[in-house]
Swiss-Prot record:
Main subcellular location: cytoplasm
Keyword ATP-binding: yes
Organism: Chlamydomonas reinhardtii
Segments forming a coiled coil: none
InterPro entries, sorted: Anion-transp_ATPase-like_dom, ATPase_ArsA/GET3, P-loop_NTPase
Gene3D superfamilies according to UniProt: P-loop containing nucleotide triphosphate hydrolases
Signal peptide: none
PANTHER family assigned to the protein according to its UniProt record, in alphabetical order: ARSENICAL PUMP-DRIVING ATPASE ARSENITE-TRANSLOCATING ATPASE (PTHR10803), ATPASE GET3B (PTHR10803:SF0)
Subcellular location: Cytoplasm, Cytosol
Protein name, as recorded: ATPase ARSA1
Loss of function: phenotype: Small chloroplast and strong decrease in chlorophyll content. Defect in the accumulation of photosystem protein complexes. Defect in the accumulation of TOC34, an essential component of the outer chloroplast membrane translocon (TOC) complex, which, in turn, catalyzes the import of nucleus-encoded precursor polypeptides into the chloroplast.
């Protein structure tokens, strides 16, 4: 296995393709970037200089791709040397561009395969073909602004500057979606129509009945909170629905093409399931709100609700209509198409195969797959030189960013074959971890390591190699994948699914103290349902009957509160699964594990995962409080007539308390400075480094211990054409693996599009225009 690394971090300076303002100087570009097909292609697409300002979230870049467009738009690209000649089937772009009726194109796949560049380049090409185009990012860790070299955040379509192309960009604002939910749910009504007066009515009524002690048990329930807690993932579902709302409005009717840059696979699968979940959840809340209209003021007072629920119901029903619109849109073959994006590796192809199965199961239209980053036969030493030059800017960002500067820096080489299996991981780990291993190994007897970062930067390879390194050192080690789109089994070439630790075997016969575990979200979800099991509300209804409140009990039973508790929201499964890992590590049979390495999902997913214990702590806390208070109220009523005999303990309360305790353990583990370390994995590109800067800031804000950053896939100075020859052979094996995935639902049934590995980062409209002309033929 040959290596391609060599630049010491931050050692190379100067020689950029941009001036101090971030604008590209064509004369300097042609001199400094001579020999780069991408740079030459950009120059061919450039006209006069423009005054477009650099994207405010990024420093001036060395990439030719950040060059602004001329004011009058790009001239047709001249013939330039191509990095590869894809053997794409003809008519791909013609089909995507045909007709003026609106089409939605969603590009999804494994993290780091270039979805943003592919989406943005397709949007640029569609706009150049005359379509009024909107490119939308639904990834919680946005990269679209970085790719377009213009800020398109804020939750509203932004017209791209410096070009006359009819092209808009939009990064979805999840906070806006949450605000809309709170408005619709009636949060904050307590102090308005009927709030305090309704609550006082409840107290007066109970006191008149001589049952003031019951209201003491009930008044802390805050039942209204059950209506006002948005589930995890609602933000994305509502946000996509909001895009549909945008394009239905008269002012946005002009969009004939909408391209979605989606989050990595696991997140996208969740996104596709969200409309069903949100639709069902909203239906329950709407039904509850409607029934509250006919309830007595006493019952309404328990929810802090005013006399009329009409306005809240109207808002929630509008929200529900939009969510249903998205649900239908995903499955409409005449309007929507999913394109799977992957790279020529076994891990990438296997994940794409699983994604296609999921899309088929959900009846999502998908007929194309694009294999990106293919090393072409014309790429040689000149390509490697350009790649080394282009990575300088990113390495300098890592060295100089205030959030990343204090971290230990690990430079991991780009290798010429895919790192799979224990021997390859052992070799890779010896190269990567040798300089920091002793420091990381110091301290606590048992340590946790979480590796995270942008999709496709090599988190699974890095985490697996670290686990093998610990095991080679004699430390009993468990490596855990929390990514819904698992790659851990592929990395070890061994099935690690099932939700329990599996002993990892080496083909060399070595007896390593190493186990692997892919968290099983479905199993975790089933366990959560068991914890929340309420027999359709039967247990709750029995409790309400026990209160002996007559019509009030009847009305509360009619509200079917149990239904609000029986649907675990998306995202909860992972948090429960992680809590389960933390829990079973406390058990005596797992006490021998000294090192636990987490291979986490891509950035946006990981940030949500780290905040989920807080969400669950709050939501599970409400459920525990609800059960406890109702049980206590029932006991109080029973004691009144039974002479003070203690009431039976609610089994569900015990289960919920245990779950809450494990959540607390997980939350504490994430933040323990002595036992836990988060390691950011990135690659030497400006876009990936910019995302790493944002991730570091978010982790530090959450109080997560962060000490190390790995810059992976660094091309070394001693890399030669032999390195690329080996890469091409390895990629050919992966492409053959794709072609062998036959059958009606296999990858071989899809139209194959091939896209080149570029020697410079694809950023800015000119580079996207050139890249799009190469790919979308």
């Amino acid at each position: 296995m040959a290596l391609a690394s060599g630049n010491r971090l931050g050692s190379a300076r100067g020689q950029t393709c941009a001036d101090a303002s971030g604008r590209v100087a064509p004369r300097l570009l042609s001199r400094a970037c001579s020999g780069s097909p991408l740079a030459l292609g950009v120059l061919a697409c450039l006209g006069a200089a423009s005054s477009v300002k650099p994207h405010p979230r990024l420093p001036a870049t060395t990439s030719a791709a950040s060059a602004p467009l001329p004011a009058r738009g790009p001239a047709p690209c001249a013939a330039v040397p191509t990095v590869v000649t894809p053997d794409n089937a003809t008519g791909v772009f013609e089909e995507l561009a045909a007709g003026q009726q609106r089409k939605y194109i969603m590009i999804s796949g494994k993290g780091g395969v270039g979805k943003t560049s592919l989406s943005a380049s397709l949007a640029v090409k569609l706009a150049a073909a005359g379509h009024t185009t909107l490119v939308v990012s639904t990834d919680p860790a946005h990269s679209l602004s970085d790719s377009l070299a213009q800020d398109v955040s804020g939750g509203r379509p932004v017209l791209l500057q410096g070009t006359d192309l009819p092209l808009w960009g939009l990064e979805i604002d999840p906070e806006e979606a949450k605000r809309e939910f709170f408005e619709g749910s009636g949060a904050g009504q307590d102090g308005e129509a009927g709030g305090p007066s309704a609550a006082s009515q409840v107290s007066d009524f109970m006191n008149r009945m001589g049952m003031g002690f019951v209201i003491d048990q009930l008044k802390e329930l805050k039942l209204g909170e059950l209506l006002n807690t948005p589930p995890p993932g609602l933000d994305e579902a509502v946000a996509i629905a909001k895009v549909v709302q945008f394009v239905q409005a008269a002012e946005y009717a002009r969009f004939s093409r909408i391209v979605f840059d989606t989050a990595p696979t696991g997140h996208t699968l969740r996104l596709l399931a969200l409309p069903d979940f949100v639709d069902a959840s909203l239906a329950k809340v709407i039904r509850l709100r409607k029934k509250l209209n006919g309830a007595t003021s006493v019952v309404r007072g328990l929810f802090g609700a005013g006399e009329s629920q009409d306005e809240a119901v109207e808002k929630l029903e509008l929200l529900q209509q939009r969510v249903r619109m998205v649900k239908a849109l995903f499955r409409d073959k005449t309007q929507t198409e999913f394109i799977i994006a992957t790279i020529p590796t076994y891990l990438g192809v296997n994940e794409s195969s699983r994604l296609l199965q999921a899309l088929r199961a959900e009846q999502i239209p998908c007929k194309r797959i694009i294999v990106n980053q293919i090393v072409g036969p014309q790429q040689g030493d000149a390509y490697l030189r350009m790649k080394m030059k282009d990575q300088i800017a990113a390495l300098e960002m890592v060295a100089n960013d205030p959030g990343l500067r204090p971290l230990r820096k690990v430079i991991a080489p780009m290798v010429d074959v895919e790192v799979r299996g224990v021997p390859a991981l052992s070799y890779f780990g010896n190269v990567v971890w040798k300089d920091v291993y002793d420091q990381m190994n110091q301290g606590a007897d048992r340590k946790f390591f979480l590796l995270g970062g942008k999709g496709g930067v090599g988190k699974t390879s890095c985490s697996s190699s670290l686990a093998v390194h610990f095991a080679n050192d004699g430390l009993p080690t468990l490596v855990v994948s929390t990514d819904p789109a698992h790659s851990l089994s592929d990395a070890f070439d061994q099935d690690l699914s099932g939700g329990s630790p599996v002993k990892i075997t080496s083909p060399l016969g070595d007896e390593l103290p190493l186990w692997g575990l892919q968290l099983d979200p479905e199993q975790a979800k089933a366990e959560l349902r068991a914890v929340l099991a309420d027999d359709g509300g039967k247990k709750l209804n029995e409790t309400l009957d026990g209160l002996g409140l007559g019509v009030i009990s009847d009305q509360l039973k009619d509200l079917q509160l149990g239904e609000l508790l029986d649907t675990p929201p998306p995202g909860v499964d992972e948090a429960i699964a992680i809590a389960k890992v933390v829990q079973f590590l406390k058990a005596p049979e797992y006490s021998h594990f000294k090192r636990i390495v987490f291979d986490t999902a891509p950035t946006g997913h990981t940030l949500r995962l780290l905040s989920l214990p807080d969400f669950l702590d709050a939501s599970i806390g409400k459920l525990v409080r609800l059960r406890q208070k109702l049980s206590a109220a029932t006991s109080a009523v029973k004691n009144l007539f039974s002479g003070g005999q203690p009431g039976e303990e609610d089994v569900a309360v015990k289960r919920l308390e245990a779950l809450q305790a494990s959540m607390e353990d997980a939350k504490a583990m994430f933040r323990n400075q002595q036992t836990t370390e988060f390691i950011i994995v990135t690659i030497p590109t400006v876009m990936a480094t910019a995302e790493s800067c944002r991730l570091a800031s978010a982790l530090q804000h959450e109080g997560i211990p962060l000490k190390t950053i790995i810059v992976n896939q660094v091309v070394q100075a001693n890399a030669t054409d032999k390195f690329l020859t080996a890469r091409r052979a390895d990629q050919a094996r992966a492409l053959h693996h794709l072609e062998e995935d036959t059958g009606p639902d296999g990858l071989a049934s899809l139209q194959l599009i091939k896209a080149p590995l570029c020697d410079l980062e694809v950023r800015g409209v000119p580079a996207l225009s050139y890249f799009g002309n190469v790919v979308w033929k």
